[in-house]
């Protein structure tokens, strides 16, 4: 950085501190990842200067010929990746992508069926503290108490009972494959629209490692970070029949000018997602998750649903004498970043929780493989077994730093 240290040393120091934290801590938050240098360059470009309300060829400002090209490239790439009929790449976030879909098909007070946040859903799938729960009448499906997986017969019965106008599938903490075809059948049976929020699994879907929702859903929303390894932002895929309505819902419905520097970074990430290397990377994310899950279970931890099919796992800590909140804090003190997370039927409040959520995308980006995952699982076990012992946490922190040195975030090939 050439100018920032002199212009704003406080912000410069905060950024350098975050760089150090990312480089010398183990990032296991399932929704976080490290973008490529190319994505960073695009997002830090002069495109941040340009206002471009509207869409390519139909802007409300002049001088948009180059940002038009950027947005067209981003739209075409994401359509190609997922085989979609229409794409909108302007949503600033996954939440705004979801809001746009709701604005297209729902009126305030309409019935909607979504996944219970406490069972792995998302705030924007009807939580009462979120706009979705305030504007619409959400009913919730969850997981089976015994299998801790979605019971599609129960979803079907609930849908027939509440007759939702929209069914939402997708999750923020569900470690198993979601059967989008079954959800689509349920939606068709009750005459509902069907939307999938694939934010967490977008990279896996792009690589063909999780069934795609695109053939089955009227609308598919996603973030561009997480497994897709792009900048923080969102996008919407839909059938052509909804294209005009979706575009109007995003602009002028809920947003003004698009963030063209972020859309450029999205385009770069989409190009990266079209490579054979990206598919191998996604395969490794899953292999790493399975290796870590197996090692944690070998060490005596109970995982929700007994394992994982994707990039994340939920660890139930109820029999370990430690809450999710305490575990998150202890691990952070040892240089390992996870997040406290509710488990299904959790007796603890959401600010405390009985579990932690662990994901492997960021460590996989660093080049770590199965052996490192098993080692990290043992480090987690060492901390959680001695979570009040500062000497143990300091020892593990040094081991974490040594491991991180072997796998720098921005190697030459990144």
From Swiss-Prot:
It comes from the Bacteria. Its EC number is 2.1.2.1. Pathway: One-carbon metabolism; tetrahydrofolate interconversion; Amino-acid biosynthesis; glycine biosynthesis; glycine from L-serine: step 1/1. PROSITE patterns: SHMT. Its main location: cytoplasm. The modification N6-(pyridoxal phosphate)lysine is found at residue 226. It catalyses: (6R)-5,10-methylene-5,6,7,8-tetrahydrofolate + glycine + H2O = (6S)-5,6,7,8-tetrahydrofolate + L-serine. It is found in: Cytoplasm. Pfam families: SHMT. Keywords: Amino-acid biosynthesis, Cytoplasm, One-carbon metabolism, Pyridoxal phosphate, Transferase. GO terms for molecular function: glycine hydroxymethyltransferase activity; pyridoxal phosphate binding. Belongs to the SHMT family. Catalyzes the reversible interconversion of serine and glycine with tetrahydrofolate (THF) serving as the one-carbon carrier. This reaction serves as the major source of one-carbon groups required for the biosynthesis of purines, thymidylate, methionine, and other important biomolecules. Also exhibits THF-independent aldolase activity toward beta-hydroxyamino acids, producing glycine and aldehydes, via a retro-aldol mechanism. NCBIfam families: PRK00011.1 (NF000586). HAMAP family: SHMT. This is Serine hydroxymethyltransferase. The gene is glyA.
């Amino acid at each position: 950085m050439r100018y920032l240290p002199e212009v704003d040393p406080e912000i410069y120091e905060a950024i350098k501190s975050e760089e150090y934290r990312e480089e010398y801590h183990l990032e296991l938050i399932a929704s976080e990842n490290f973008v490529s240098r190319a994505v960073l360059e695009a997002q830090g470009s002069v495109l941040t200067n340009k206002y471009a309300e509207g869409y390519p060829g139909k802007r409300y400002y002049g001088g948009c010929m180059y940002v038009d090209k950027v947005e067209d490239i981003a739209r075409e790439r994401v359509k190609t990746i997922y085989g979609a009929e229409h794409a909108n790449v302007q949503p600033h976030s996954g939440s705004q992508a979801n809001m746009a879909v709701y604005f297209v098909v729902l009126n305030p007070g309409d019935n909607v069926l979504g996944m219970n946040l406490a069972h792995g859903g998302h705030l924007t799938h009807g939580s009462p503290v979120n706009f979705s729960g305030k504007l619409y009448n959400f009913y919730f499906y969850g997981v089976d108490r015994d299998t801790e997986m979605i019971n599609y017969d129960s979803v079907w019965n609930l849908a027939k009972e509440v007759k939702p106008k929209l069914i939402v599938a997708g999750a923020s903490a569900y470690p198993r494959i979601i059967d989008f075809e079954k959800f689509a059948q349920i939606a068709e049976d009750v005459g509902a629209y069907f939307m999938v929020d694939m934010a967490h699994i977008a990279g896996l879907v792009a690589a063909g490692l999780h069934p795609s929702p695109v053939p089955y859903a009227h609308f598919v929303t996603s973030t561009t970070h997480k497994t897709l390894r792009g900048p923080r932002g969102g996008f919407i895929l839909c059938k052509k029949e909804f294209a005009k309505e979706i575009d109007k819902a995003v602009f002028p419905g809920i947003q003004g000018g698009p963030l063209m520097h972020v859309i450029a970074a999205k385009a770069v990430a989409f190009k990266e997602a079209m490579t054979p290397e990206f598919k191998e990377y996604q395969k490794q994310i899953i292999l790493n998750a399975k290796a870590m899950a197996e090692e944690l279970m070998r060490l005596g931890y109970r995982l929700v649903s007994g394992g994982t099919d994707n990039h994340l796992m939920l660890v139930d800590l109820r029999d370990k004498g430690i809450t999710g909140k305490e575990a998150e804090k202890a691990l952070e003190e040892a240089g390992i970043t996870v997040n406290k997370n509710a488990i299904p039927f959790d007796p603890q409040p959401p600010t405390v929780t009985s579990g932690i959520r662990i994901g492997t995308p960021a460590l996989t980006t660093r080049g770590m493989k199965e052996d490192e995952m098993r080692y990290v699982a043992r480090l987690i076990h060492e901390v959680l077994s001695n979570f009040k012992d500062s000497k143990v946490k300091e020892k593990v922190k040094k081991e974490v730093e040594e491991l991180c040195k072997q796998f720098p975030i921005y190697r030459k090939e990144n």
